A protein has these predicted regions:
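Outer-envelope exported proteins of Gram-negative bacteria
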Residues: 45, 208-210, 214, 288, ...
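N-terminal regions that are enriched for targeting/export leaders
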Residues: 1-12, 28
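Surface-exposed amphipathic alpha-helices with a cationic face
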Residues: 35, 195-203, 328, 352-353
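Domain-scale activation on soluble regions of proteins
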Residues: 36, 162, 169, 472, ...
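Alpha-amylase-like alpha-glycosidases and glucanotransferases acting on alpha-linked glucans and related
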Residues: 10, 16, 54-192, 217-445, ...
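Conserved, well-ordered alpha-helix/loop/beta-strand core segments that scaffold catalytic motifs
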Residues: 184, 188-217
Length: 500
């Protein structure tokens, strides 16, 4: 990665009149805004179909896209919806919030209406899409249709015949739920069509997309249902152990994620084909891919299934560099960012070095005594060129609120490091942004909320909590020319401007 800069903003957080950010005109406008701000990258969160809890890191599929992101305006232009129908829908009254319960009802109703008016049976592009993607699409669409039939229950609670994918049951549900299966294929077709168009536009403006994928798939996913042999499941397809992380300064009982763990010996036996295919598909969608929880490839935390916390977990060895050598042999060199935050053993550090991928540096961790990593690694003067620097990520407090909540001693450390005792507290975030922009890190990614100087009301996610996460949205009025000019000036000053 060349010396550059970018902004972190989930698609869901874009402005939109339809309850959630999507592939609408506002997304294209944001691309234009980024270009004028001198940026090279737009980093987003995973684009997968979200489930209960609304986390993009717990998706029903590692390959399917979120129908919430389909532009309704584009469907109006196609003639399968009317502007009046879209305007009549109630997506909630707050322009800076996502009301997922209303979204589920209203968008679902409109998308089904669009499907009922579409002529996909005679659409050659739809047929070609289904044929090209049948290797994941057939299982996913059937999974979603059967899930609806079983009133949304996780697949491990379905009837035994379809839970274990007995052929007579598979054939029966494909016939019985044919139109429902086609509906889910239609949604994926529209998602793919609209996303590729938006990405092509971004690339034409010199903006590259940094995508994000979780290392694990969700237990309640088409991936686990269709490929039980690749995961640590018993003969009844029930997990024997699940993923998480041990206790640390942020979470005294650790984090119990609940994802099924990989059966790495099964992946090794196939030459890691599932992972090669997954990453190949990611690079069809993104220019750069950030892999969350990269340390899990060196060693992963295994928690007995049924545990209420992560305290009884233990570390086990992962595939290590062998996996990424197989990926490189199959796909060539690709741009991957290794999320290597938190406590890193020497073997994890060695894996990151051996891979050649840039790791991540988060400014907030440099001054926060709760962090279990080495704080000095996160001080900007120590950032290596082969790294991506952030003020914070989607899991962190906004820079403004973080500075307010750390201790007096930690705030003094920040002031001393900046050698700035005059700037008012409420404006100090700008000095901290400038601090990482002038570091040696090849790329700097700043969350949009930090450029805006927003507090935790704009925080994306607080790990180990549910209810108020993944909801913040940007208001269109916040994308001002003044802010754009300020970002461009700082980006240019520190040699990061995109001149494309």
């Amino acid at each position: 990665m060349q010396r550059s800069a970018g902004i972190l903003l989930p698609i869901s957080s874009l402005p939109s009149p339809y309850g959630i950010g999507c592939f609408s005109q506002e997304a294209y406008d944001f691309v234009d805004w980024l270009k004028e701000a001198g940026q090279t990258y737009c980093q987003i969160l995973p684009l997968g179909v979200t489930s209960y809890g609304d986390s993009p890191y717990q998706s029903f599929s590692a390959f399917a896209g979120n129908p919430y992101f389909i532009s309704l305006d584009a469907l109006v232009e196609e003639g399968v919806l009317t502007a009046a129908e879209c305007k009549k829908a109630n997506f909630g009254r707050k322009a800076d919030d996502i009301d997922y319960s209303r979204l589920y009802t209203e968008r679902g109703r409109l998308l089904r209406l669009a499907y009922s008016r579409s002529d996909i049976g005679h659409n050659e592009a739809f047929t070609a899409f289904c044929e090209k993607n049948k290797w994941w699409l057939d299982d996913f669409a059937l999974f979603m249709a059967v899930k609806d039939r079983f009133e949304g229950k996780p697949w491990i609670e379905w009837a035994e015949d379809i839970r274990l994918r007995w052929q007579p049951a598979m054939d029966y549900y494909r016939r019985e739920l044919y139109f429902e299966v086609e509906y889910h294929k239609y949604l994926q077709f529209k998602f793919d069509e609209q996303w590729r168009k938006l990405k092509a536009y971004a690339n034409s403006k010199g903006i590259q997309i940094i995508g994000d994928i979780p290392i694990y798939v969700a237990l309640d996913s088409a991936d686990a249902w269709a490929n039980p042999g690749l995961f640590q499941l018993d003969k009844d397809n029930i997990p024997t152990a699940v993923a998480g992380v041990p206790p640390d300064g942020f979470s005294p009982t650790g984090q119990l994620w609940g994802n099924p763990l990989y059966r790495w010996e099964a992946h090794r036996a196939t030459g890691y084909q599932w992972w090669i295919t997954r990453l190949w598909y990611c690079f069809e969608l993104y220019d750069v891919v950030r892999i969350d929880h990269f340390r899990g490839f060196d060693e992963y935390f295994s928690i007995p299934y049924g545990s209420e916390t992560a305290v009884d977990g233990h570390w086990e060895k992962g595939p290590g560099i062998e996996l990424f050598r197989a990926v490189e042999q199959a796909l060539g060199k690709r741009e991957i960012i290794a999320e290597d935050l938190g406590y890193m053993s020497e073997t994890v550090r060695q894996l990151v070095r051996d891979s050649g991928f840039p790791g991540m540096k988060v400014l907030e961790f440099a001054f926060d005594s709760r962090d279990t990593g080495s704080a000095s690694d996160y001080l900007p003067h120590n950032y290596p060129v082969n790294s991506v620097a952030y003020t914070g990520t989607h899991d962190n407090e906004t820079l403004v609120s973080w500075y307010q909540t750390i201790s007096d001693a930690e705030r003094a450390m920040v002031r001393d490091y900046l050698y700035d005792y005059a700037t008012p507290d409420e404006q100090l975030y700008k000095s901290m942004i400038a601090l990482i922009l002038r570091s040696a890190a090849a790329t700097c990614i700043i969350p949009m909320q930090d450029w805006l100087g927003l507090d935790n009301a704009a925080r994306i996610n607080k790990p180990s909590t549910v209810g108020q996460n993944w909801r913040w949205r940007l208001k269109k009025t916040q994308l001002t020319k003044k802010l754009q000019k300020e970002i461009c000036q700082l980006t240019t000053r520190y040699g990061r401007k995109n001149w494309a």
